[in-house]
Amino acid sequence: MRHKRSTRRKRASATQLYQTCKASGTCPPDVIPKVEGTTIADQILRYGSLGVFFGGLGIGTGSGTGGRTGYVPLGSTPPSEAIPLQPIRPPVTVDTVGPLDSSIVSLIEESSFIDAGAPAPSIPTPSGFDITTSADTTPAILNVSSIGESSIQTVSTHLNPSFTEPSVLRPPAPAEASGHLIFSSPTVSTHSYENIPMDTFVISTDSGNVTSSTPIPGSRPVARLGLYSRNTQQVKVVDPAFLTSPHRLVTYDNPAFEGFNPEDTLQFQHSDISPAPDPDFLDIVALHRPALTSRRGTVRYSRVGQKATLRTRSGKQIGAKVHYYQDLSPIQPVQEQVQQQQQFELQSLNTSVSPYSINDGLYDIYADDADTIHDFQSPLHSHTSFATTRTSNVSIPLNTGFDTPLVSLEPGPDIASSVTSMSSPFIPISPLTPFNTIIVDGADFMLHPSYFILRRRRKRFPYFFADVRVAA
């Protein structure tokens, strides 16, 4: 067992020790001078400050701001502020007085009237007017004629083709109530005009349902799913339950709980840490609704899942986005499908391996019980005849391979295919006689004349540089 090391207790501060040990006289020798300020450093500062004055420089135990003027870099002068100049008063003129001048100063008399310069306007007085009246005492006489026959007046009007009466137009009736535009005019005009039909967006013609003339918005374009982006993890699902009940891959099924609708977005809550039935669906909190897409010639069933791998203290969930997909079936062209159907129709429907089975679709073969298929010494291409109960025999060529033992051989035709040999045929080399080693014995030889001429050697000149000195 490892021994625990004892921790060192911190010593009390000098101020705390001074308060407790001053009265009893048990203070350490370095406590009292430090608290009372009688150390050697304090005495040097105390007596040295009597002969040296550092006022205004901020040297000492101050705030370290450099005093009132602050710190100034060496070799530079602090910027001086411009002193604002006060306005100079004009000098007062002093009259010189001689000895013979009078000592009485004449005063200037002030007048109470101020001459404005322009005369005051005068208001004209109304002069009045004369009214002359006259009175006539003669009574008024009215001449009244007797009532005669009534006169008939006729008025005839002629139509002027160069002038037409302007038509009086009234505001049209509101078209929102019934959906029809009605224009009325009390007079008939002969103006030529073009009748332009107006489009109305009112659908209902019922006067009870009040609609507006706002056009109906069209369908929005289909947004991109973004299933194959860089931030989305691609996971292929093989389990068929992913199509019908995807919740079984995330959580374990509870029989007492109502089933999920696979066409909606599924939300999951994980209260405790438990593994998912499928490890690919671990930490899934949401499975969005499915989408059918076609990619690379297949019909793909896709769902986007949201994981909650991390959870912060504030409750925010952080996780990756996963694209789960399952390919349903390949999309093939029409011609390939027709060709496959024709090939499928030619295949045999009888899959029995009994020797008594009959395939009526392609051939009729009846094999005997004779053990002829275990002959391992048969040649490369042999013909085996099977006896049947019919009046004729059918001879079918069989290929047993390169003399290899057969474990089992199902009855049926063996179609021989032409096998091309990969080895090339042997071609003899002419001459057929082998070469013998020829040995020539001799003590002398003749040199070819081309070797008598010696090559001229090129002279090698040493290269020296005038500005370089090499030490030997």
UniProtKB/Swiss-Prot annotation:
The entry's keywords: Capsid protein, Cytoplasmic inwards viral transport, Disulfide bond, DNA-binding, Host endosome, Host Golgi apparatus, Host nucleus, Host-virus interaction, Late protein, Microtubular inwards viral transport, Phosphoprotein, Viral penetration into host nucleus, Virion, Virus entry into host cell
Domain of life: Viruses
Molecular function via GO: DNA binding; structural molecule activity
InterPro entries: Late_L2
Short motif Nuclear localization signal, span: 1-12, 453-461
PTM text: Highly phosphorylated.
Subcellular localization, as worded in the UniProt entry: Virion; Host nucleus; Host early endosome; Host Golgi apparatus
GO cellular component terms, A-Z: host cell; host cell endosome; host cell Golgi apparatus; host cell nucleus; viral capsid
Disulphides: 21-27
GO biological process: microtubule-dependent intracellular transport of viral material towards nucleus; symbiont entry into host cell; viral penetration into host nucleus
Keyword Chloroplast attached: no
Subunit structure: Interacts with major capsid protein L1. Interacts with E2; this interaction inhibits E2 transcriptional activity but not the DNA replication function E2. Interacts with host GADD45GIP1. Interacts with host HSPA8; this interaction is required for L2 nuclear translocation. Interacts with host importins KPNB2 and KPNB3. Forms a complex with importin alpha2-beta1 heterodimers via interaction with the importin alpha2 adapter. Interacts with host DYNLT1; this interaction is essential for virus intracellular transport during entry.
Function: Minor protein of the capsid that localizes along the inner surface of the virion, within the central cavities beneath the L1 pentamers. Plays a role in capsid stabilization through interaction with the major capsid protein L1. Once the virion enters the host cell, L2 escorts the genomic DNA into the nucleus by promoting escape from the endosomal compartments and traffic through the host Golgi network.
Family: Belongs to the papillomaviridae L2 protein family.
Protein known as: Minor capsid protein L2
Species, as recorded: Human papillomavirus 58
Gene of this entry: L2
